[in-house]
Design a protein with these regions (language model features):
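Surface-exposed extracellular loop regions of Gram-negative outer-membrane beta-barrel proteins
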Residues: 61-63, 110-124, 311-319
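Internal alpha/beta core interface subdomains
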Residues: 123-128, 176-194
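Outer-membrane beta-barrel and related beta-rich outer-membrane complex signature
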Residues: 63-67, 116-122, 178, 235, ...
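Catalytic Cys-His active-site segments of thiol-dependent hydrolases/isopeptidases
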Residues: 107
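Beta-barrel outer-membrane channel/assembly domains of diderm bacteria
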Residues: 1-104, 128-168, 173, 202-206, ...
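Surface-exposed cleft-lining segments at the edges of enzyme active sites
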Residues: 194-197, 241-244, 282
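Flexible, surface-exposed loop regions and adjacent strand-edge segments
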Residues: 68-71, 121-126, 182-184, 238-241, ...
Length: 342
């Protein structure tokens, strides 16, 4: 059993960004210092299985870096909840099959991107959008009750292999206000669908994800698809592209992602790229989400003088309503990670 803690402090601001997320506002654009603390518990009964629980606390608000689903500036480490400690992960994973080629995941608090392979070697740990590989519709980090299964071709470690992932997560209206899937009207300690919806009701925020991928020795590619119902949402969408689906709406999201990295760390960077398209159907009233698309390209270097450290640069566009006459924002980030101790 292992208990791992992680404390994050973030100093920053978005000039001209309002407290309600509206740009060009007179207020809400000042510099702030926020914090987040995570405690991860990992335990195993057989050495091959995993029971994971995570507690979090923080003081972020929804904007400009926090938990709103339609927040393009959202950071990865942005727990809110007024420094209250809450449980936001609880699931169990175990292998199946003679060669452990299947892995089953089941739990009350699990996220689809953590039980699915996102083919990317760009890891900045800064802007949330780039952690989805540019496909925030398929890999939307839905959090709630769920089940998933993974099959990986049973070959020797490091050999090219096929990978298939299937999972379903319920992330409806009862998600935790402290969690980064809360869409409003939520309360600490709850997640997923409540008893008024049930886990299989179309209004409970169903996220059904399927993926087929291939892992080469130094490259990988995957095609993904997600079906979403009322209360599910595209991650970090711009404006109405990121709000939860209204009653009667459905979302069919598709994505293609891939990466390549050199065999040895040096001046040649690894490259990761992804594209996603989200088709929203069904009648609703405004402000309902619309069909959207997103993409990203990320480069990451491991310096030849110190392979434990890394630098990276990424560019992309978050999910923006397809054909919309409004702005089509671009996101750019650069980072350098330095390990200060061993």
């Amino acid at each position: 059993t292992t208990l791992k803690g992680e404390a994050t402090f973030i100093l920053g601001g978005v000039p001209g960004y309002g407290a309600n997320g509206a740009p060009n506002s007179k207020g809400g654009g000042q510099t702030t210092l926020n914090d987040e603390l995570r405690l991860n518990l990992y335990t195993s009964f057989s050495g091959k299985d995993l029971l994971r629980a995570r507690w979090g606390a923080g003081n972020f608000s929804s904007y400009p870096f926090g938990t709103s689903s339609s927040n393009i500036f959202k950071l990865i480490h942005t727990e809110n909840g007024n420094e209250q400690v809450f449980l936001d992960r609880l699931y169990y994973q175990f292998p199946i099959g003679e060669h452990n080629q299947f892995k089953l995941s089941i739990g009350a608090l699990m996220r689809n991107n953590e039980i699915t392979w996102i083919p990317s070697v760009y890891h900045s740990d800064v802007l949330d959008f780039f952690s989805t590989g540019g496909s925030s519709g398929v890999y939307n980090k839905a959090l709630g009750e769920g089940v998933g299964i993974r099959w990986k071709q049973p070959l020797r470690a490091g050999k090219p292999a096929w990978v298939v992932n299937l999972n379903a997560i319920v992330s409806g209206s009862a998600v935790s206000s402290g969690s980064d899937s809360c869409t409003g009207g939520c309360s600490n300690g709850a997640s997923g669908a409540d008893s008024s919806d049930g886990i299989l009701n179309a209004g409970s925020g169903i996220n059904a994800l399927a993926q087929v991928g291939y892992q080469g020795e130094n490259w990988g590619v995957a095609v993904g698809y997600r079906f979403g119902t009322t209360q599910s949402a595209v991650r970090t969408g711009n404006g109405v592209a990121g709000v939860p689906l209204a009653t009667g709406q459905q979302d069919n999201s598709v994505a293609i992602n891939g990466y390549w990295h050199p065999h040895h760390a040096g001046w040649i960077p690894s490259i990761s790229s992804g594209f996603g398209y989200n088709i929203v159907s069904g009648s609703s009233t405004a402000p309902a989400p619309q069909s959207s698309r997103s993409w990203m390209v990320g480069l990451q270097w491991s310096p030849p003088w110190e392979t434990a450290h890394a630098a990276g640069l990424a560019i992309g566009q978050p999910a923006n309503a397809a054909g919309a006459t409004g702005s089509s924002p671009w996101l750019v980030e650069g980072f350098y990670g330095y390990q200060v101790s061993n």
